[in-house]
């Protein structure tokens, strides 16, 4: 199958950017999905030892991928400890 794809790419070189962008998009989406699965506090893989991982986050912990105008280090703690 890979030989057939390579043969088609050699005969139609205009398809090369299409393969590059689709492959790059698929790679970036898998990396983002992995980041969500490992770093997001809403997702818990170990229910016995850490059933509620969102309770261990402080107000100055950044778990978003991108924040525009927010400086998390200057926030005060306004939540009770559990």
Swiss-Prot record:
The keyword Transport applies. Keywords: Electron transport, Membrane, Mitochondrion, Mitochondrion inner membrane, Respiratory chain, Transmembrane, Transmembrane helix, Transport. The lineage of its organism: Eukaryota, Metazoa, Chordata, Craniata, Vertebrata. It comes from Danio rerio (Zebrafish). Component of the cytochrome c oxidase (complex IV, CIV), a multisubunit enzyme composed of 14 subunits. The complex is composed of a catalytic core of 3 subunits MT-CO1, MT-CO2 and MT-CO3, encoded in the mitochondrial DNA, and 11 supernumerary subunits COX4I, COX5A, COX5B, COX6A, COX6B, COX6C, COX7A, COX7B, COX7C, COX8 and NDUFA4, which are encoded in the nuclear genome. This is Cytochrome c oxidase subunit NDUFA4. Residues 38-82 are mitochondrial intermembrane. One of its GO terms (cellular component) is mitochondrial inner membrane. Residues 1-14 are mitochondrial matrix. Belongs to the complex IV NDUFA4 subunit family. The chain crosses the membrane at residues 15-37. Its main location: mitochondrion. It is a single-pass membrane protein.
